[in-house]
Design a protein with these regions (language model features):
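Bacterial N-terminal signal peptides that target proteins for export
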Residues: 2-20
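Helix-centric, low-specificity signal for extended rod-like, repetitive segments
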Residues: 8-10, 26, 376
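Enrichment for repetitive, rod-forming helical segments
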Residues: 11, 22-24, 48, 53
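Bacterial N-terminal signal peptides
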Residues: 18-29
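Noncatalytic, solvent-exposed loop/strand surfaces
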Residues: 33-484
């Protein structure tokens, strides 16, 4: 693993330190200090865990949040909250900050975003840095997308960055590093922004100035609403966040627009940005490859072609980049014909160090811990390989197919499959320690598929389900598992 959060913090530039100060100054303090989650799965090794966190030793359910929404993206822990994006009715979007307090009950949602503020479906797991939450919107069926920056403490908007275009969507997680925000945008390639410099009403302002303006206007809207309620409560319309000005971050660079198709999350390590691009067979667009860019200007440093599409995105493991590939997308009906491979390339020049084919697709990120690469596949197996050589350490018995990434922490691996079975396994040999069936467990009773990988924070495991493929309306759930 090249880039633990502590290593990132020790190597950030002065600019990123100023950026962090701006975020703190621009926002009210949180009740609980949140651990940053600045990229997909929490870090470039894609462990799905807050640094130095341990997961649960048993499958005890602490709380369940039932819903009719479909949770495709993984949950994201953020201090005393867990953030979830979902598809609501008619493919509308929902984004919620849920309290992790087991006693929260019906008041679990601390704040939420929906229409009219969110205009496109959202399947992007957010990134969190200080009081800034960043997530994208749009799916394969939509054109054009918006990158959103909102406040963690209140959910109020900070900024938006729209990217128009056909087959443009932001499905992967953003990455926040060195004072920059980066995200893949489908046919828009990769976009790199400076969220410390915003355009508002034709003028450049910093993040703190923009928030002062937004707070003042939000207060005016609330005051007007309270005044109208006193005059005629039946016709008073609550204020909408969509009525606020929309500051726009400064574009630093954009690479690969019209050449690449970037649906997965990017990884940032040192002065490099690593991304994976797919080739869309139906639309005949994109480039099936792993690509290394220079963080400073987005110029291409190297490119490595691939046999299958790299839906899993990149994982950084020391001086290697690991990528899982699949011949099929996240479509259950296509699973019988899935083929795939894992490819390890040099972080420096993209040269292939090893590659192994498997009779299944790898559609979610590989997790790396203690020199071991752990990944799930559509054949229902969890595999652990040696990072340096690619040799197999262990493989679990086949069960239900997997779309979701594993989470790894403190000698344990946590996985969840398309039948809603959550397992805790030993990292050393893959032996099962505990299992929880979300469909049959008396505390949950919510059958569903898990698309977004489970995540770990402060001894707890969070997992969310979707039922897009269910012929009947079945409740979905966000589930918190922990020993206490």
């Amino acid at each position: 693993m090249t880039i633990k959060l502590s290593e990132m913090e020790s190597n950030v530039s002065l600019r990123s330190q100023v950026f962090a100060v701006l975020l703190v100054v621009a926002a009210c303090p949180l009740a609980t200090q949140a651990a940053d989650w600045p990229t997909a799965r929490g870090n470039a090794a894609r462990t799905g865990a807050v640094e130095n966190s341990a997961g649960p030793k048993s499958g005890r359910v602490l709380w369940v949040h039932k819903s009719t929404d479909h949770y495709i993206a993984a949950p994201v822990p953020a201090g005393d909250l867990v953030l979830v994006s979902s598809l609501a009715a008619f493919n509308t979007s929902s984004f919620q900050a849920l309290s992790i307090d087991p006693a929260a009950g019906a008041k679990r949602a601390r704040w939420s975003k929906a229409v009219p503020y969110l205009k496109l479906p959202t399947v992007s797991a957010p990134a969190v840095f200080g009081n800034l939450v960043v997530f994208g919107d749009g799916m394969h069926q939509t054109d054009g997308a918006i990158l959103h920056g909102v406040r963690l403490d209140t959910g109020l908007p900070l900024w938006q960055y729209p990217v128009p275009g056909q087959l443009v969507h932001m499905e992967g997680s953003p990455a926040i590093a060195n004072g920059r925000v980066l995200i893949g945008g489908g046919n828009a390639g990769v976009v790199c922004l400076d969220p410390g410099k915003l355009e508002l009403n034709g003028k450049e302002v910093d993040a703190a100035q923009a928030q002062v303006i937004l707070d003042a206007q939000w207060k005016e809207l609330q005051t007007k609403y309270e005044r109208e309620k006193k005059i005629d409560p039946d016709f008073a319309i609550p204020p909408s966040e969509d009525s606020l000005p929309k500051p726009k971050p400064k574009l630093v660079w954009q690479s690969g627009a019209g050449k690449w198709h970037v649906d997965s999350s990017v990884a940032v390590t040192g002065d490099r940005v690593i991304l994976t691009s797919a080739f869309l067979d139906v639309e005949k667009t994109g480039d099936r490859s792993i690509i290394g860019l220079k963080l400073a200007d987005g110029s291409e440093a190297w490119k490595t072609p691939l046999k299958h599409n790299p839906w899993a995105g990149p994982t950084i493991a020391g001086d290697l980049v690991l990528v899982g590939c699949s011949s099929v997308r996240l479509e259950p009906r296509d699973l019988p014909k899935a083929q795939g491979e894992v490819v390890a390339v040099s972080l420096t020049d993209g040269s292939v160090k090893w590659r192994n084919e498997i009779p299944a697709g790898v559609v979610s990120a590989i997790a790396v811990k203690d020199g071991i690469a752990v990944f799930t596949a559509t054949d229902g197996c969890v595999r652990a390989w040696d990072v340096a050589s690619g040799k197999e350490r262990w493989k679990s018995d086949p069960a239900a197919p997997f779309f979701a990434s594993p989470a790894v922490a403190d000698g344990m691996v946590y996985v969840a499959d398309l039948k809603g079975l959550v397992q805790g396994m030993k990292l050393s040999d893959g032996k099962q320690v505990w299992a929880l069936n979300l469909a049959t467990d008396s505390a949950v009773q919510a059958p569903g598929m898990v698309y977004g990988g489970p995540v770990i924070a402060a001894g707890r495991l969070y997992v969310a389900t979707c039922n897009l493929e269910s012929p009947t309306k079945v409740a979905t759930a966000v589930v918190c598992i922990g020993d206490k």
